[in-house]
Amino acid sequence: VEEVKGFVGNFKVKIRKKARFVDETKCTGCKVCMEKCPSRKGLNEFNMNLNNRTAIYIPFAQAIPNVAVIDPTQCLKLKTGKCGVCQKFCGAGAINYDMKDEFLEREYGAIVVATGFRPINIDAFNEYGYSDNKDVITSLELERIMNAAGPTKGHFERPSDHTQPKKIVFVQCVGSRDTSGCGKEY
């Protein structure tokens, strides 16, 4: 959201729609572009950075629209002018490296302010060894690991060696009711 003008019942909202470099009206979601993309160093944000993704990707399973997006910080064509593999293999002709951000203006009667949330910084709690041991994970990371569309396809594996653990310890509410300043007092 770039700008909001107006009053309850009559808001005019200016929205920036970031360039995805893929035409939403042409992309079929076939994923051939993802299979062929040579840039595979981007961390998969949706999977809590537990695995990598290609420079062109569909943000998450069942995304609406089910259309790929290109990460301009990872795409070799956008960074160096060389590559273009996804465009070559896109049978729908959906790849557009010249796409720019769009600004949309919409009218709304009401606005819901959803501020989101920020996960607690687990690194501040050294006693759990999160920074030192790959097999110490957060509940959100566990959720992605156990999800059928997650990085392990729902198989419970240790991140360090991809073997099944024999025992686990589940520590809940790390940082809640914390008065040291690292967590939340509530």
Stretch-by-stretch model annotation:
Residues 1-26, 38-88, 92-137:
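Non-heme iron-sulfur electron-transfer modules
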Residues 19, 174-176:
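Residue-level signal for short, function-critical loop segments
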Residues 57-76, 141-164:
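Surface-exposed acidic, glycine/proline-enriched linker/cap segments
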Residues 114, 171-173:
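Short hydrophobic segments within beta-strands
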Residues 125-130, 179-186:
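Glycine- and acidic-residue-enriched helix-capping/strand-helix junction motifs
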Residues 165-169:
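Residues that mark the start of a beta-strand
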